[in-house]
Amino acid sequence: DFSAGANDLSYGFKRAKLAWYSIDPIFYTQKPSGISNEDLSLNKTRRIFSRELYPVTDIAQGQTQVISTLDLTYYPSERGPYNNSLNTASNPISNFGGIMRAVNSTNFEQGNVEYIQFWVLDPYVGKGETPRSNTGKIYFNLGEISEDVLKDGRKQYENGLGPDQILASPRPLWGDVPASQSLIYAFDSNVDNRKNQDIGLDGLSSANEGAVYTNFASELDPAADDYTYYLNTSGGITDRYKNYNGPEGNSPVNINDPNRGSTTFPDVEDINRDNTMNTINAYYEYSVDIQPGMTVGQNNITDIRSTQVTLPDGSSTEARWLQFKIPVSQPENTIGNISDFRSIRFMRMFMTGFSSELSVRFGALDLVRGEWRRYTNTLDFNDTNVADDNTNLDVLAVNIQENNERCPVNYVTPPGVQREQLYNNNSIINQNEQSLSLRVSGDGLEPQDSRAVFKNVSIDMRQFKK
C-alpha cells in the first residue's frame, strides 16, 4: 500500500520520480540545440507515424499523420515530489510513481464500459531498448480515489495562498494550506501576489521548504516539486521533460518568460474541479506485467503488431506494439466499500516493481464501451445457475484498422462487404470496418449450453406490417 495508512511525512517515502508528457513536434521539426538525430532515433523518443500502428488507415489530406503518444518515464531510484526519504535509491522496486484524472461519464453500467484498452510500444524491442531484467507492473484503479495528495485532511489550492490570505494555523504537516473555502480556481491578478501563489501543493516556496523536508534542506529544491520548461533546459528529450510536471513555478506571470508555463490554472487537490476534496478510497484495481517476450493470450494481450521503421539517423529498427484489453468487470482487487460500476469518478495509473529507468509509450489509451451487452440469465431451463459453469464470455469488437495482422487469427473484411468510403478534399478515405466478436473461455461451453448478447434499441416497429 506504499505507506498509505501513514499520517506523517512517511506517507510520501515510496513516491519516486515520474514524468508524463507528449513530445512537442518542435523536437522533430526545429531541433533545439543539443538534440541530435541519434537522440530522435531512440525507442523512447522517436516520432511515431500513423502507418506504423495503423497501416491500413487512410488519412485525409491535411490531417496529421503523426500519433501523439502519451509517454511515461519512470525513475524508481530518484525521489518524487514531497518525498523526504533518504532511502529511495536503496530499494527501487518497492517505490511507485503514478498519475490520476477525473472520469467525465461516471456510470459505467449505463454506458456499458467493458474494457481498459491500450496500445503500448514494447520497451524491450528497438533501438535503446530497456534491459530485459528491468521488469515491473502498471496498475489501474477505477472508482473513488482520494484527492488528498499530501494527506492531511485539508484541501490545497494555490490561489488561496499568499501574504494577504488566511492560512491554517498551526501550520499543517506538509506546509501552508488555505484556511478558507475555495470559491473559484484562478490566480490573483496582482503580479506580486501571483508569485507567492504558484508554489506547489505544499504551499511553500523552495526557499522555505527546507523547514519541512529537512533531509534535503541544503538543496535548491528540497521538496523536489519545481517546474522546468523542456526548452529551457539541456540534455536528451526525456531529461528535458523530467521536471515538466512540477507544480511549483508552472504558471509564470509573463507569457514571454523563456520558462514558459504548462498551465494557467492553479494546482489544486481537486482533480475533478467540483470544489470539494474527496478523501474516500473505494476502487477496483487491475494490473498488467511489463516484461520481455509478452505474447497474445497472456497478460490481457489481444494483439501484437511488429514492423520495421526507418530512423532519423539512417538506420532501421524493429517496432513491436502490444494491444492490451483489460475487462473492467474482472478486477484483481477491490479496495474499500464499492460494489458496482455506477459511480466511477476517478482513474489512477501507477508504475512499480522496476529497478531502473523505463519509458512506456501509449499509442492509444481508451475506456471502451459496447452497444451489445451480455445476457446473464440462463438459456437452459434445467440449469438455473449459470455462475457455476466456469464459462467466461468476452464481448469484443475487432476491426480492419487495428486487427488486420492479429495473431493467431487476423481480421479480414467479410465476403461481399466493402469499406464505406468518404470523399474528402478530392480524395477517397476508406472508413473503418468492424465486427462483433464473441469469445468463450474458462472451461468453455457445456454440452447443449449457450451464451448470448443483446442490444437495446429504440425503434418504433408499429409502422411496419410484418
What residue ranges belong to the model's regions?
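Extracellular/surface-associated beta-sandwich interaction domains
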Residues: 1-466
